[in-house]
């Protein structure tokens, strides 16, 4: 495989490949749908059972993220650190999948949210870049992810915050 690749379909195959031997997995998607969690759950469960550091950050922008998706993601394993960006109406639209591995790092940045369609059969474009080609960009992506993930605009996902978000979602 080349060090830079355009991925236009079946992103799930790339995610599976890089999740398999990752030391850390960082997922940043503006929206999370239950269908996407259904696709990723087995891979996330397998990774967390190997003590992989997994962090997920999604947003409440336009209330597209489904409460059931957050609940299903939360139920995978308590060691997966999930946070919700509280947008206050401001656009929140990133999509990135970052993998730190023993040999290298890989970042996939593009149009794919966490939905079955985006991960499997939808028309999506993502750029896969290996750390060896874009070391500075990869390092910056990790730093920016961690900055967003721990930003004061985010809140940890737990039973109470899911309940609160569900109420807001239903009222929107």
Q: Model-found features: residue ranges?
A:
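PLD/PLD-like phosphodiesterase catalytic module centered on the HKD motif
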Residues: 1-172
């Amino acid at each position: 495989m080349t060090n830079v690749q355009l991925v236009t379909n079946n992103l799930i195959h790339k995610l599976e490949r890089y999740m398999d031997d990752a030391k850390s997995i960082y997922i940043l998607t503006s929206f999370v749908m239950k269908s996407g969690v259904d696709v990723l759950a087995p891979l996330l469960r397998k990774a967390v059972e190997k003590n992989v550091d997994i962090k997920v950050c999604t947003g409440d922008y336009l209330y597209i993220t489904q409460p059931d998706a957050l609940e299903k993601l939360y139920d995978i394993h308590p060691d997966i650190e999930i946070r919700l960006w509280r947008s206050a109406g401001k656009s929140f639209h990133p999509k990135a999948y970052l993998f730190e591995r023993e040999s290298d790092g890989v970042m996939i940045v593009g149009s794919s949210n966490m939905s079955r369609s985006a991960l499997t059969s939808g028309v999506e474009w993502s750029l896969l870049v290996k750390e060896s080609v874009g070391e500075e960009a990869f390092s910056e992506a990790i730093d920016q992810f961690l900055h967003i993930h721990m930003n004061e605009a985010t809140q940890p996902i737990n039973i109470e915050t899911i309940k609160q978000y569900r109420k807001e979602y239903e009222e929107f």
